[in-house]
């Protein structure tokens, strides 16, 4: 069965191991174009454009990426609550049609850091944010697909005669690990995004989301986000992991990352679970490495899969066996890793997926 392979682009050269989040211009246009084209040349299907309360606007960045490439698709991270879903629907559909159709998707991030929420003026509590996200996704989908005006009155939004003359088939991605997130994503998302956790925990999360989706008469697909660390031999891959750990540790202690462990006001259930798993042991399932996770504290996608290209592909395909059909992979050396993966890892993932069928598909 075919899979979808996602990367992630940034507007400047920065990762846990090098560059600066806070120093220098926030947007390097030539770098962004090079980064996007590297993904396209390496055979990626789509790239995620992240969201933060102090980051460049994702819709504008997406337009730049789409302009710089011919086939590469984008996944725009968006935090519901600040722009009406009817407006977001028109923005998405317009961008999609202007770039040939079928190249735009949206990833709903409800928000798990109270300080980051407040920077944009959001003081809603955790449960309220997920209720708002669910209502947002419902209105968004209806606006994208309805050929007739409609009215809506809910807890957070009220519209009379809502209608968009420009419509598109925009996939709705979603992420979250709390019970409220499971309820919201299972009811509204097309793709449920998961962080890289051990196989047993991932299988249980997929089971829970599918069970909730059945209650709504829906089927849902799954994405897994990890940070591959690949080298010619397994020993060299683990040596590279140690170099990444050392570089990250030095930057955390010196403040070079622009954030530091303990300063987050995270309410993210998923981030807390990653911290617990990393504290339990540093390596799970032979290759899932928490070395960076343990250093940077609550945050985003930080668990790595370490080994040769063949070993990493096989480790990721074990998640495919559980039902994962989308993989989001990003590196610690962002552009160079993408180029290397295009030579080996991406083809190996596609070839391996064609030879196996994920759980819950084709039954």
Question: Regions from the language model: what does each represent?
Answer:
Residues 46-65, 196-200, 328-342:
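Glycine-rich, proline-tolerant flexible connector loops at the mouths of alpha/beta enzymes
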Residues 2-12, 119-120, 126-165, 199-321, ...:
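An alpha-helical appendage that flanks or caps ligand/catalytic pockets
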Residues 82-97:
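Glycine-rich anion/phosphate-binding loops
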Residues 24-38, 174-184, 308-319:
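Short, acidic/polar
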Residues 41-44, 101, 189-190, 324:
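A structural motif
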Residues 39, 43, 65, 95, ...:
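Conserved, mostly hydrophobic/aromatic
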Residues 3-9, 47-49, 73-78, 104-108, ...:
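Hydrophobic faces of well-ordered beta-strands that scaffold small-molecule active sites
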Residues 1-69, 166-170, 361:
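N-terminal beta1-alpha1-beta2 module of alpha/beta enzyme domains
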């Amino acid at each position: 069965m075919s899979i979808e392979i996602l990367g992630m682009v940034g507007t400047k050269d920065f990762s846990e191991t090098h560059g600066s989040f806070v120093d220098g211009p926030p947007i390097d246009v030539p770098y962004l174009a090079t980064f996007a084209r590297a993904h396209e040349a390496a055979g990626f299907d789509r790239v995620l454009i992240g969201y933060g309360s102090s980051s460049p606007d994702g819709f504008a960045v997406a337009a730049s990426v789409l302009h710089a490439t011919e086939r590469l698709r984008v996944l725009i991270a968006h935090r519901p609550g600040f722009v009406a879903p009817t407006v977001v629907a028109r923005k998405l559909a317009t961008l999609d049609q202007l770039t040939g159709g079928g190249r735009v998707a949206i990833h709903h991030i409800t928000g798990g850091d109270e300080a980051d929420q407040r920077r944009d003026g959001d003081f809603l509590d955790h449960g309220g944010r997920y209720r708002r996200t669910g209502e947002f996704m419902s209105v968004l989908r209806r606006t994208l697909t309805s050929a007739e005006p409609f009215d809506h009155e809910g807890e957070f939004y009220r519209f009379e005669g809502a209608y968009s003359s420009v419509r598109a088939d925009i996939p709705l991605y979603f992420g979250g690990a709390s019970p409220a997130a499971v309820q919201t994503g299972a009811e509204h998302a097309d793709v449920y995004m998961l962080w890289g956790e051990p196989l047993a925990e991932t299988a249980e999360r997929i089971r829970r989301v599918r069970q909730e989706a059945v209650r709504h008469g829906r089927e849902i697909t799954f994405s897994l986000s990890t940070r591959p660390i690949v080298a010619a031999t397994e020993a060299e891959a683990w040596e590279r992991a140690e170099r990444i750990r050392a570089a990250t540790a030095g930057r955390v202690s010196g403040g070079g990352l622009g954030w530091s462990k303990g300063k987050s006001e995270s309410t993210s259930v998923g981030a807390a679970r990653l911290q617990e798993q990393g504290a339990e042991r540093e390596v799970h399932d032979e290759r899932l490495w928490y070395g960076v996770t343990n250093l940077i504290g609550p945050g985003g996608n930080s668990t790595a899969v370490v080994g040769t290209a063949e070993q990493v592909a096989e480790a990721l395909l074990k998640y495919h066996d559980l039902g994962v059909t989308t993989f989001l992979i990003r590196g610690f050396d962002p552009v160079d890793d993408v180029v290397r993966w295009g030579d080996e890892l991406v083809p190996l993932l596609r070839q391996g997926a064609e030879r196996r069928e994920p759980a819950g598909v084709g039954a």
